[in-house]
């Protein structure tokens, strides 16, 4: 059995397929997706279709067990669907137009109920194998246990405060994404696996990263769309 985490996909369906092929996962394996499945990239609907297939394969025992965490972009999409105040404008300026374009059909935006339901059941945080998985990070002023006992969804989805902070209060290593890095960040109590697959046009970025745990072995594939 292997435990993997996969970083921010951001609509890069072909890149995700290449990474999954590279990992050669079995039904005995476990995979935690760090969130941000949609926005900015060319094929957000196809990414969600792929994740739904992985979920179905896991339920049938034909694929690895999967945990799909929620990212801030996934939350923005849900807020838009729910008609939350200012949700469209916030989503629009954060890459949501690429996602909406993928759902255009006959001049209308048609988002499948299965995609909405999938995002609605994504948790914000997950513990497994001696690691805590979360999209953005945790509050560095509190221990990991305190963060989990008093969860702050906005911190889990949006924070970057931990990246330059003293993490001495964190008693458990945290695996996150959200903030793109040219290389995976690998510290004793922090792993960041967002290597900016969707930012392939920027120097140093443009790979999708997985990490195998607890070995901390990184697997990266270049952007393919």
Please tell me what each predicted stretch does.
Residues 1, 76-77, 97, 104:
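Detector for methionine-enriched segments
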Residues 1, 27-30, 64-65, 124, ...:
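Short coil/turn segments at beta-strand junctions that form active-site/ligand-binding loops
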Residues 2, 6, 11-89:
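Core catalytic region of metal-dependent phosphoesterases/phosphodiesterases
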Residues 93-192, 196-206, 213-224:
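Acidic, His/Gly-enriched loop-helix segments that form or flank divalent-metal centers
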């Amino acid at each position: 059995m292997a435990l993997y985490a996969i970083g921010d996909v951001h609509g890069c369906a072909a890149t995700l397929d290449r990474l999954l092929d590279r990992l050669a996962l079995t039904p005995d394996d476990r995979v935690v997706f760090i969130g941000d499945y949609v926005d900015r990239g060319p094929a957000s609907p196809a990414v969600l279709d792929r994740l739904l297939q992985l979920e179905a394969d896991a339920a049938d025992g034909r694929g690895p067990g999967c945990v799909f965490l929620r990212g801030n972009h996934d939350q923005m999409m849900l807020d838009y669907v729910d008609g939350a105040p200012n949700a469209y404008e916030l989503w629009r300026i954060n890459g949501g137009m690429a996602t909406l374009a993928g759902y255009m059909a006959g001049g209308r935006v048609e988002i499948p109920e299965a995609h909405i339901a999938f995002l609605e059941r994504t948790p914000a945080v997950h513990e497994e194998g001696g690691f805590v998985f979360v999209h953005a990070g945790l509050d560095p002023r509190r221990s990991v246990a305190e963060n989990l006992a008093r969860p702050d969804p906005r911190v889990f989805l949006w924070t970057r405060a931990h990246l330059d902070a003293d993490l001495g209060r964190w008693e458990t290593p945290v695996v996150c994404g959200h903030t793109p890095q040219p290389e995976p960040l690998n510290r004793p109590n922090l792993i960041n696996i967002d290597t900016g697959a969707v930012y392939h046009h920027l120097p140093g970025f443009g790979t999708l990263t997985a990490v195998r745990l607890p070995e901390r072995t990184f697997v990266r594939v270049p952007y393919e769309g």
